[in-house]
A protein has these predicted regions:
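Conserved hydrolase catalytic core segment
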Residues: 144-183
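Short beta-strand/loop motif that positions the catalytic acidic residue
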Residues: 294-295, 301-303
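Conserved HGGG/HGGXW glycine-rich cap/lid loop of the alpha/beta-hydrolase fold
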Residues: 56-113
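Conserved alpha/beta-hydrolase "acid-adjacent" motif
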Residues: 308-314
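Conserved acidic catalytic loop of the alpha/beta-hydrolase fold
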Residues: 128-146
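N-terminal cap/lid segment of alpha/beta-hydrolase-fold proteins
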Residues: 39-60, 272
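A catalytic-pocket lid/entrance helix-loop region that shapes and gates access to the active site
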Residues: 169-219
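Catalytic active-site module of serine/aspartate enzymes centered on a nucleophile-bearing elbow/loop
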Residues: 325-370
């Protein structure tokens, strides 16, 4: 029997989500505004299998599987880069119909070595390394093709992976569309000061005066690798304070990074600035340039109308280049927000419904969830 979202059946959740949305069209773009937020996620679930995978270069990745071992395979790509997977990420998938794989990317979460240890070298942590890691994990688990779910940085990584290995991706489910291009790094670290001037000045003033007119991500990266623990700790706190400023639409949103323990702040700040200082190890414009490789991969892009961390133009340009991708803009969301979650769950349930229908056609005797 198909598991139900918390306190609601699957069909009821879809009906409730639909009733919460006011839909109106502008051209080909459907905008959805949620009157209020209801938790449509599935109940908390624990993994039924975990492990560590040696991927070379001295790195071992933590991975876990939850849900139905015979369900539709899906892999979750977390954000950051460097944030690691969280238990809530498991809850967007129907555990009766999905085989969900989560893993912590290099130097993140429970993978080793961890970036929160200041002596750890990040040189073997690049986008091409992560793409190879995804393939190694897929092969290790004996999965032929899988749905790729990515949020924020996970969108960038998921697109890069899908463009490199389209034959291994059945669908793309992307939330908070981002770009690895340097203009977006410049926007987040400098131009966004027009939106949050007081907070940005504090952020800018966290680096030496001689570096304040240059690449702020690179300047912070240098501070975060300082031999002085006090310098590292202050830089990590300043970076995380700035991240918390712009990732939420709600002015009274509860901070997350800025109140994390110092080692966790250091870990994510080191990895993020390492990537941003190197253009995310991708060519400028690469993901749009190679979007033709996504042909025949269906998917969804869920984006907040007021996402200042990733302006809507990024998702809009991708939607024009990816003909099989559906763009849904959530009117009450920023870079994250509860209004985005029911849209994503609705899509994931549609994908599972299609799989069940296809299997019933080819195997009429099969039962639900097979």
């Amino acid at each position: 029997m198909t598991a139900a979202p918390q306190e609601k059946g699957s069909s009821a959740a879809r009906a409730t989500a639909a009733s919460l949305m006011v839909r109106y069209a502008v051209g080909d773009l459907e905008l959805r505004h949620h009157a209020h937020v209801v938790d449509h996620r599935y109940p908390p679930i624990e993994p039924h299998e975990t492990g560590m995978l040696d991927v070379g270069d001295g790195h071992s990745l933590y991975w876990e599987q939850c849900g139905n071992p015979d369900g539709k395979p899906a892999v979750v790509l977390h954000g950051g880069p460097g944030s690691g997977c969280r238990p809530g990420m498991r809850r967007q998938f129907d555990p009766a119909r999905y085989r969900v794989v989560l893993f912590d990317q290099r130097n993140a979460g429970r993978s080793t070595p961890w970036a929160g240890e200041p002596e750890v070298d990040l040189s073997a942590n690049t986008t091409p390394h992560l793409m190879r890691d995804i393939e190694r994990l897929r092969q290790h688990l004996g999965i032929d093709r899988w749905l790729v779910w990515g949020g924020s940085w996970g969108v960038t990584l998921g697109l890069a992976y899908a463009e490199a290995h389209p034959e291994r991706v059945s669908e793309l489910a992307l939330a908070a569309i981002t770009s690895p291009d340097r203009w977006l790094t410049h926007w987040i670290t400098r131009d966004m000061g027009r939106v949050f001037p007081r907070e940005w000045e504090r952020f800018r003033d966290g680096v030496p005066a001689a570096e304040r007119e240059g690449d702020l991500a690179a300047a912070y990266s240098r501070l975060l690798h300082s031999p002085d623990p006090a310098v590292r700790a202050k830089a990590a706190q300043d970076w995380c304070d700035w991240e918390d400023t712009h990732v939420s639409l709600a002015p009274d949103a509860e901070p997350s990074l800025s109140v994390a323990d110092p080692a966790s702040q250091l870990a994510i700040a080191r990895v993020v600035t390492h990537y941003w200082a190197h253009g995310c190890f991708l060519d400028d414009g690469q993901l749009l340039r190679d979007a033709h490789r996504l042909a025949d991969i269906p998917g969804i892009m869920v984006h907040g109308r007021y996402d200042v961390s990733g302006p809507l133009d990024v998702a809009w340009q991708l939607s024009k280049a990816w003909s099989d991708g559906e763009l849904v803009v959530v009117g009450d969301a920023g870079h994250s927000g509860g209004g985005m979650t029911p849209v994503m769950i609705e899509y994931l349930n549609r994908v599972a419904d299609r799989r069940a229908g296809a299997e019933k056609t080819t195997c009429p005797e099969s039962g639900p969830g097979s």
